Amino acid sequence: MIQTYSTTIRRKEMDAVLTCMVDEKIGPGELNTRLIQLVKEFFKCDGAVALRSPAIALGYALTALELEKGSKVMISALAPAWQYQALVSYGYVPEVLDVNENDGLVSVDEIKNGIENGGKILLLHETEGIVPKFDDILELGVPIIEDISMSAGASVDLGELDGVGSERNGNDKSIVDNRKKVGSFGVYTILGLEEKDVITAGG
């Protein structure tokens, strides 16, 4: 049987794990600092925080957005289970949106329905690395938390996005060769490094 997800760990990464164990240090260290710097350089963002899990990151993002407890957060029906579980545990109400059968993404019409039903924030999961049409979604004006755990490294041709052109992103450092990386469209971005994500970490 061919596994859909197959995590790997290289000798260099194993050596890093062993080094941490030998150092007998608990808490943020050199590797944590290097990871943050790499993320900032790759995504051309001004700030990043390394946390143990994407669920913890989601909690901080919702707190930063000052979302009231009991508010509805829109998520994809194909979103990983941790998103639903985390929202419930933090006191929010998941508004599950159906997906398009052709690409597995939430449609703009479905997001509109979610907003009409009281959805305050869109937690945008880019299923299996498939990138949505950001132009139409951004026009809705709803705050977006992008989950790029499965799409990290992908980019969008700005020539295909009429509303996300130079007038909106003239000074955007994330735009290179008229392409904009996923993770730079939302208010906050979550990059999970779990075993089924596109980039995995050793824990």
Residue ranges and their predicted role:
Residues 51, 97, 193:
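Hydrophobic residues at beta-strand termini and immediately following loops
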Residues 46-48, 71-72, 120-121:
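Short active-site oxyanion
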Residues 59-114:
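Conserved PLP-anchoring active-site segment centered on the Schiff-base-forming lysine
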Residues 102-201:
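Active-site phosphate-binding strand-loop segment of PLP-dependent enzymes
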Residues 6-7, 77, 127:
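Conserved donor-binding loops in enzymes that form glycosidic bonds
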Residues 1-64, 68, 90:
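Conserved PLP-binding active-site segment in aminotransferase class I/II-type PLP enzymes
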Residues 50, 75, 124:
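A short beta-strand submotif of the Rossmann-like class I SAM-dependent methyltransferase core
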